[in-house]
Amino acid sequence: MQKVVAIVGPTAVGKTSLAIEIAKKLDGEIVSGDSMQIYKEVAIGTAKASREEQAEVKHYLVDAHSVFEDFSVKNFVDEARSAIGEIAGKGKLPIIAGGTGFYVNALLNDMQLGDKEEEAASVDPEWEVFLAANGPQALWEELNKKDPEAAKKIPVANSRRSLRALSVISRTGGLFSKQQAEIKTRYDYLIIGLNSDREAIYQRINQRVDLMMEAGLLEEARFVYEHRAGEHQVLQAIGYKEFFPYFAGEASLETCVMALKTASRRYAKRQLTYFRNKLPVEWYDPLTDPNCANRIAVRIEEWMKEEK
């Protein structure tokens, strides 16, 4: 089974720099595990590795697509797995670096994913009719009757997920929650998590936003705002939508910058919650441990010798 290392953690903790250091120590190449770094038109708000950093170590799935293209998690997984195969084919270590937990999870494990068209086709029309006639609450209650465990994990308002779960139950005759629990491992992976004191992370987030503003984030956000027609994924990215009220003349720039810092701190908290609940992570503190990168490199080398 192919060995893969993932380096995860909250925004601004230092994943990119540490991943590059580890890649240089252990002859690896990096696959971005970030849902927004794939887009070539946005660089500042997505905190991509710099051109100089990318020249040091080869990066995959950075600047690979336009914001005007549809790019689903399934597309990401397909391209990332291809990149892992390419890296392994060169005898190098594939290193996933990123903070989008669901994307990393989907990549490392055999999660059942479909593109938008496949997902739409997999929905039972009878449940769509039921939803239209009775609403999200009634739909969720039907799911709760048939599969309480699945219902616990799906918000009442998320009709799309309720539809999918009920459709799977109707089609297979089995519980949706049981099928989700049977997700298989795709790779032999080691997940390294970076984290530190909450206030230290929050301070780094605030500093990063200030540096992004100096680097031209406002103009990048203006580009996104001016192309907001449609359903482009980047419209929902933290770092851009917070400035929309400013461009619309509804809020001051200072207010929007503060909103971005707040949104980024909340996102960091959600990232940590996901990684702690969904993935087997070994945690390290790069902000207080000056030997962190060396300790991680030693741990990876030990793990590389293990058989699975």
UniProtKB/Swiss-Prot annotation:
One of its GO terms (molecular function) is ATP binding. Its EC number is 2.5.1.75. The keyword ATP-binding applies. It catalyses: adenosine(37) in tRNA + dimethylallyl diphosphate = N(6)-dimethylallyladenosine(37) in tRNA + diphosphate. Residues 34-37 are annotated as: Interaction with substrate tRNA. Its cofactor is Mg(2+). ATP binds at residues 9-16. It holds the Pfam family IPPT. Gene3D superfamilies: 1.10.20.140, P-loop containing nucleotide triphosphate hydrolases. InterPro entries: Dimethylallyltransferase, IPT, P-loop_NTPase. The keyword ATP-binding applies. One of its GO terms (biological process) is tRNA modification. The record marks 100 as: Interaction with substrate tRNA. Substrate binds at residues 11-16. Keywords: ATP-binding, Magnesium, Nucleotide-binding, Transferase, tRNA processing. Catalyzes the transfer of a dimethylallyl group onto the adenine at position 37 in tRNAs that read codons beginning with uridine, leading to the formation of N6-(dimethylallyl)adenosine (i(6)A). Monomer. Belongs to the IPP transferase family. This is tRNA dimethylallyltransferase. It comes from Lactobacillus delbrueckii subsp. bulgaricus (strain ATCC 11842 / DSM 20081 / BCRC 10696 / JCM 1002 / NBRC 13953 / NCIMB 11778 / NCTC 12712 / WDCM 00102 / Lb 14).
